[in-house]
Amino acid sequence: MTDPDSYRSSITSRPSFNRTVTSSSQNYGAPGSGNRVLKIVTETHSSSVSSGLSPYGQNAASTIRDNREREKKEIMELNDRLASYIEKVRFLDAQNRKLDADLKMLQGRFGKSTGSVKVMYEMEITTATNVVKQTGKDHGETEKEIRKLQDQLDELRKKFEEAQRGRAEDRLKIDDLLVTLSNLEAEINLLKRRIALLEEEVARLKKENFRLTSELQRVRIELDQETLLRIDNQNKVKTILEEIDFMKRGFETELKELQAQAARDTTSENREYFKNELANAMRDIRAEYDQIMNGNRNDMESWYQLRVQEINTQSNRQNAENNYQKEEVKRLRNQTSELRQKLSDLESRNLLLEKQIEDLNYQLEDDQRSYEAALNDKDAQIRKLREECQALMVELQMLLDTKQTLDGELKVYRQMLEGNSEGNGLRQLVEKVVRTSAINEEADTETMRVVKGEHSSRTSYQRSAKGNVAIKETSPEGKFVILENTHRAKEEPLGDWKLKRKIDGKREIVFTFPSDYILHPFQSVKIFARGQGIANPPEVLIFEGDETFGVGANVQTILYNNKGEERATHIQRQSQQTTSS
């Protein structure tokens, strides 16, 4: 029998625990026998998600996400209830075995130290009462903390709703700015098109001006040639006139000689004949000469007048066209300058609007991330407190049930110790000492055999990420590792990133991504060890360095970027435990 002075109660409140069971593979053994494997997954993930989908895509994504969250919560509640039932059954089973052993011990040794049994159970009742009071006090503090956190959550929800309204207003403002930007871009394109047309017109006019200038130059060259030809002809006329004068003088000299000869001729008939012939010849020569001179003079005058008239007409037309082209070029230059000035103003305004839109988008994303992070933290705290409160309530109910059971058993023990009205209770128990001792030994042996057959294996996972890339899953057998990009619209370049896997703090396996590898939004990549899968880039890669990523009781998988910074972690811990009462 245990000494009452050294006896310590075994009734204590169960340690608080955070139940975040999200694994879909759980194996619960039957109460009191077999192996029990409980897989606990704790995920910590922080990432920035920007809204890059259309409203219909966002509604569909939010609906799917809500359904998944609701299903996960239902699974978590069912897992909690199942674990609670199993733990309650095991606890009651162990409690029954302990009480049965105590009862048999008391029955076997009754009459030797009955007073110590009473002291032991009074200590048990006192300890259970203190535990109930302490549990009630913890329950009240937890309720106060929950109400306080509920107020903070309401305040944060109000702020979040205000942020949502501000976000909607910013969206409307952004839409208006986008409409304005589109109009400005359309106007800019129209002005650019007009400028291009005007530049084409200016080029055409320049070509026409060059053609007319070339034509004018050609006409001037022809005029110079005609002028030179006229001067040449005038010189020829002068030369011919001089020749005519010379011939006239020669003819006159010859005529005088003939007259002198005729004068020397004494015959009057001969003199008259020669005189008439000479007069006729001179008249014919003079008439022919005058006719030739008049014809040449008329031809030259008509030709020169025609050429001068043509040159004057072309010169006047060319001057008029040049003046019109100069005016048109001046007008086009002024219009081009005005359009370029307006285009510069519109481009400046466009840059300002784009800068404002970019600033508003950054501010909106920062506000959304901060509010979502705050709400997630508060929701996690409230969920944790509720789980603790629920566990305390279950524990309190179990303690109350235990107290009631102990009260009933104490009442029975008192009746057994005090005996009935005939006073034969103690005597009957003393007579059964030898027989109950044998039964007690047999029961203890069987109980130890059952307890030694119970083993529990506990595997826990913990994930964290500092960005959009997270370690989604690792194979417990070391066959593969899966990474995912949680962002909706942003690509993540993973070139030269390293995936390190540490096995029990001893072995280290390193996989390096290709230098040009990019992980697309909402996509995942599965990395197989050598011989464990078939390569299908970019969705499936093969690690040629080893046939396995390694297995162990403590496995750490860490993702580093090309600068050596830690971006994501995945920790797997496995422990096996043998329990006995």
UniProtKB/Swiss-Prot annotation:
<dbReference type="InterPro" id="IPR036415">
    <property type="entry name" value="Lamin_tail_dom_sf"/>
</dbReference>
<comment type="function">
    <text>Cytoplasmic intermediate filaments provide mechanical strength to cells. Essential protein, involved in attachment structures in epidermal cells that connect muscles to the external cuticle. Probably acts by forming hypodermal hemidesmosome complexes that help mediate muscle-cuticle force transduction. Although expressed during embryogenesis, it is not required for embryonic development of muscle-cuticle linkages nor for the localization of other proteins to the hemidesmosomes in embryos.</text>
</comment>
<dbReference type="InterPro" id="IPR039008">
    <property type="entry name" value="IF_rod_dom"/>
</dbReference>
<feature type="region of interest" description="Head">
    <location>
        <begin position="1"/>
        <end position="74"/>
    </location>
</feature>
<feature type="compositionally biased region" description="Polar residues">
    <location>
        <begin position="7"/>
        <end position="28"/>
    </location>
</feature>
<dbReference type="GO" id="GO:0031507">
    <property type="term" value="P:heterochromatin formation"/>
</dbReference>
<dbReference type="GO" id="GO:0098609">
    <property type="term" value="P:cell-cell adhesion"/>
</dbReference>
<dbReference type="GO" id="GO:0005882">
    <property type="term" value="C:intermediate filament"/>
</dbReference>
<dbReference type="Pfam" id="PF00038">
    <property type="entry name" value="Filament"/>
</dbReference>
<keyword id="KW-0175">Coiled coil</keyword>
<feature type="region of interest" description="Linker 1">
    <location>
        <begin position="107"/>
        <end position="120"/>
    </location>
</feature>
<dbReference type="GO" id="GO:0090435">
    <property type="term" value="P:protein localization to nuclear envelope"/>
</dbReference>
<comment type="subunit">
    <text>Forms some heteromeric filaments with ifb-1.</text>
</comment>
<feature type="domain" description="IF rod">
    <location>
        <begin position="71"/>
        <end position="424"/>
    </location>
</feature>
<feature type="region of interest" description="Disordered">
    <location>
        <begin position="449"/>
        <end position="469"/>
    </location>
</feature>
<dbReference type="GO" id="GO:0030056">
    <property type="term" value="C:hemidesmosome"/>
</dbReference>
<keyword id="KW-0965">Cell junction</keyword>
<feature type="region of interest" description="Coil 2">
    <location>
        <begin position="277"/>
        <end position="424"/>
    </location>
</feature>
<dbReference type="GO" id="GO:0051664">
    <property type="term" value="P:nuclear pore localization"/>
</dbReference>
<protein>
    <recommendedName>
        <fullName>Intermediate filament protein ifa-2</fullName>
    </recommendedName>
</protein>
<comment type="similarity">
    <text>Belongs to the intermediate filament family.</text>
</comment>
<dbReference type="GO" id="GO:0007097">
    <property type="term" value="P:nuclear migration"/>
</dbReference>
<feature type="region of interest" description="Linker 12">
    <location>
        <begin position="259"/>
        <end position="276"/>
    </location>
</feature>
<feature type="region of interest" description="Disordered">
    <location>
        <begin position="47"/>
        <end position="68"/>
    </location>
</feature>
<dbReference type="GO" id="GO:0005652">
    <property type="term" value="C:nuclear lamina"/>
</dbReference>
<keyword id="KW-0403">Intermediate filament</keyword>
<feature type="region of interest" description="Tail">
    <location>
        <begin position="425"/>
        <end position="578"/>
    </location>
</feature>
<feature type="domain" description="LTD">
    <location>
        <begin position="457"/>
        <end position="574"/>
    </location>
</feature>
<dbReference type="GO" id="GO:0005200">
    <property type="term" value="F:structural constituent of cytoskeleton"/>
</dbReference>
<feature type="region of interest" description="Disordered">
    <location>
        <begin position="1"/>
        <end position="35"/>
    </location>
</feature>
<feature type="region of interest" description="Coil 1B">
    <location>
        <begin position="121"/>
        <end position="258"/>
    </location>
</feature>
<dbReference type="GO" id="GO:0005635">
    <property type="term" value="C:nuclear envelope"/>
</dbReference>
<feature type="region of interest" description="Coil 1A">
    <location>
        <begin position="75"/>
        <end position="106"/>
    </location>
</feature>
<dbReference type="InterPro" id="IPR016451">
    <property type="entry name" value="Intermed_filament_ifa/ifb"/>
</dbReference>
<dbReference type="InterPro" id="IPR001322">
    <property type="entry name" value="Lamin_tail_dom"/>
</dbReference>
<dbReference type="GO" id="GO:0006998">
    <property type="term" value="P:nuclear envelope organization"/>
</dbReference>
